[in-house]
């Protein structure tokens, strides 16, 4: 029964987060060359707040609510990150760029993250501590996104010059 309360809302939240994040990222990109980075920054910071709220919640209902918000806000960055990657390379390099992007996200996010959470959980005796320990990556992600915001316009200009 818990799987239904966690899994189904998580799938719906992920769908909504990716879809809305992509639409917002594209709208922001039309206004500013680094516009999509704002969505990536949101996707790095907002989930951290909701994860803390979820794992310190006083009831299962609040945990489920904050878990949905964590997934929706975190997944909002995926489309923006993939689209930014595509924008930065010439068309002939998009397959390679996508492969590298997915290797990075798969190895870092889907392999190392759960391993580290499990390892820290085993050492501390607390699953919540294991999961909350992963929040150390949020400031790093935010700093990298801010750096990307600053450097992206020059990278876009270089790509345009290469295409000529």
PLM feature segments, named:
Residues 45-49, 135-142:
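Small-residue-rich packing faces within the transmembrane alpha-helices of Major Facilitator Superfamily
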Residues 1-13, 129-132:
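Loop-to-transmembrane helix entry
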Residues 17-33, 121:
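Helix-to-loop junctions at the C-terminal end of transmembrane segments
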Residues 30, 149-164:
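Intrinsic disorder in cytosolic terminal tails and internal cytosolic loops
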Residues 33-81:
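C-terminal transmembrane helical hairpin of 12-TM major facilitator-type secondary transporters
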Residues 35-38, 118-138:
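A membrane-interface helix-boundary motif in multi-pass transporters
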Residues 18, 88-124:
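A late C-terminal transmembrane helix in Major Facilitator Superfamily
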Residues 3-4, 41, 95, 99-100, ...:
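Conserved glycine-rich helix-kink/hinge and helix-boundary motifs of the Major Facilitator Superfamily
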